[in-house]
Amino acid sequence: MCRCPLEHHEGMMTSAEAVAVAGSAQEHGRPKWPPDKPQVLGQPAPARVVVAALVWLLAGASMSSLNKWIFTVHGFGRPLLLSALHMLAAALACHWGAQRPVPHSIHRRVLLLSLTFGTSMACGNVGLSTVPLDLAQLATTTTPLFTMALSALLLGRRHHPLQFAAMGPLCLGAACSLAGELRAPPAGCGFLLVATCLRGFKSVQQSGALLQEERLDTVTLLYATSLPSFCLLASAALVLEAGTAPPLPPTDSRLWACVLLSCFLSVVYNLASFSLLALTSALTVHVLGNLMVVGNLILSRLLFGSHLSALSYLGITLTLSGMFLYHNCELVASWATRWGLWNRDQPGKGL
């Protein structure tokens, strides 16, 4: 995770830290927020974060490649239907695990999150069905920039100056990669751009619902959002894909096995994503998500024979350098301080 001081990060705490702080405040008769030693309170969190991040990265990379395989090899021209099946699988999987009903006070926020959730998934799958997998993944590298801007505007979060600096190589790398892969249709790129923006907005919404006053658990929140999203996506698939998409082959067992596996990976991916948001932050999740891009580029080359240009490889290098700067901003700041390039007493003035 990012090694920035808490005061320069996003002003957020994990649920484990919040419970410990509340108990400490009751014992001493006065509130204490934030705690003096957050690293002690959050000792169980690192292992959980690592496990959730690994599961999230593996499930996400596998699901993207499998979805592209379904669209390309099996000719499954119904991305909205596939998105609806993903949401139906999430609702069925989380039905018995939801711990409590969603409070009435946040029903509107949950419905808005469901709308964003379903729309981002639909746009992502529609874009993935029309553009190469490598380009679809490279487009997602700009998600941290949207997430940082939205978290600052909507939630008033503060960020370390070097985190803002890290957005430069992240987005420049995405721009170079996209410029080197202009063979994709404009409509597909448009859907990917919309999906990227909505993904950042969705993460900010999820982070607020999970980590603020209601503190919903991941299974309950996924169940609450999956049902409205399924209704939205199923209706869209019925209206937009019923008469235009080719008929489904009912006897193609390999296709339906891939669809079932895709639904399973979607449930695992969403649960891991929600857990990461509860343990870290929306911005950290999307910066980590850029690791998924590298894995999908390798899979795209192996499975679909994609070949990247030199400009795209330059973009990958810039993206990885931006990720390093974001996650090691305190290390970079201490190195710059020794060389007289960074003044810790004036955090607003950077490199």
From Swiss-Prot:
Compartments where found: Membrane
Coiled-coil regions listed in the entry: none
This protein's record includes keyword Transmembrane: yes
Domain EamA: from-to ranges: 125-179
Record keywords, A-Z: Membrane, Transmembrane, Transmembrane helix
InterPro entries, per database record: Sugar_P_trans_dom, TPT_transporter
Annotated TM spans: 40-60, 79-99, 110-130, 135-155, 162-182, 218-238, 258-278, 279-299, 301-321
Membrane topology designation: Multi-pass membrane protein
Cellular component, GO annotation: membrane
Family that this chain belongs to: Belongs to the TPT transporter family. SLC35E subfamily.
General function of this protein: Putative transporter.
Database matches in PANTHER family: SOLUTE CARRIER FAMILY 35
Protein name, per record: Solute carrier family 35 member E4
Lineage of source species: Eukaryota, Metazoa, Chordata, Craniata, Vertebrata
Gene designation per UniProt: Slc35e4
